[in-house]
C-alpha cells in the first residue's frame, strides 16, 4: 500500500505541474485537472488506509501520522486552489505558500516516520 500511495503522489504532482503549465500557456487544462482530481481520491484513500493500518499496529506514532495526514490534505487543498485560481486568472500567491509549506512538512514527516525512508 505504501508503494501505491507514493506512486499516486508522484503522479499527482506530475499532473499538477502539467495542468499548471497548460493554464499558464492559456490553453485548456480541464482534462488533466480532472485526472488530477481522480488522483486526489486515490491519494486520500490510500493515505487513510495507511494511517489506520499503522495506528492499529503501533499507537506510539498516532499523533505524528495524524499531523502528516493533515499536512497531506493541505497539500491537496493548495494544489487544487492554485489550479482553480489559475483557471480564473486570479492571484495564487497565498495558495502557493500553503502548497510549498505543507509539501515540505509532508516530505519531512514522510522521511522521519517509521513507514517511510529513514533519512533523518
From Swiss-Prot:
Keywords: Cell membrane, Membrane, Transmembrane, Transmembrane helix. It comes from the Bacteria. It is a multi-pass membrane protein. It is found in: Cell membrane. The chain crosses the membrane at residues 6-26, 32-52, 64-84, 91-111. InterPro entries: UPF0344. It holds the Pfam family DUF1516. One of its GO terms (cellular component) is plasma membrane. The keyword Transmembrane helix applies. The keyword Cytoplasm does not apply. Belongs to the UPF0344 family. HAMAP family: UPF0344. This is UPF0344 protein BCAH187_A1308. It comes from Bacillus cereus (strain AH187). The lineage of its organism: Bacteria, Bacillati, Bacillota, Bacilli, Bacillales.
